[in-house]
Amino acid sequence: MTRIKRGVSSKFRHKKILKKTKGYYGARSRSYRIAFQAFIKAGQYAYRDRKNKKRTFRKIWICRINSAVRKHGLSYSCFMYKIKKLSIFIDRKILSDLAVLNKEAFSELIKKVKSIS
């Protein structure tokens, strides 16, 4: 049985990781061992932040709705309660877009909500 050296396969594996860590700072882009650790950690951060992104955007939408609703003399919680009571099922993303991009439609919605005592 002949001996098989692993230089070619390891070089390919190293090049693959170093290519993925190209823009990293310092040894993280040059040294394979450190680059591999940085690559693994980057994957962990990416996985975590894909989950956190959903939370962050929900917070942003709520802040936008709250600030727009307070200009009309309502609180966010009161507005959401009344909107559910009217059976208007618009999610927070669409409500925040209305508040920012289409102020006339949002003010009409608030008039409708204010008509309920």
From Swiss-Prot:
One of its GO terms (cellular component) is ribosome. GO terms for biological process: ribosomal large subunit assembly; translation. PROSITE patterns: RIBOSOMAL_L20 (PS00937). GO terms for molecular function: rRNA binding; structural constituent of ribosome. The keyword Ribonucleoprotein applies. SUPFAM superfamilies: Ribosomal protein L20. InterPro entries: Ribosomal_bL20 (IPR005813), RIBOSOMAL_L20_CS (IPR049946), Ribosomal_protein_bL20_C (IPR035566). It comes from the Bacteria. The keyword Glycoprotein does not apply. Belongs to the bacterial ribosomal protein bL20 family. Binds directly to 23S ribosomal RNA and is necessary for the in vitro assembly process of the 50S ribosomal subunit. It is not involved in the protein synthesizing functions of that subunit. This is Large ribosomal subunit protein bL20. The lineage of its organism: Bacteria, Pseudomonadati, Pseudomonadota, Gammaproteobacteria, Enterobacterales.
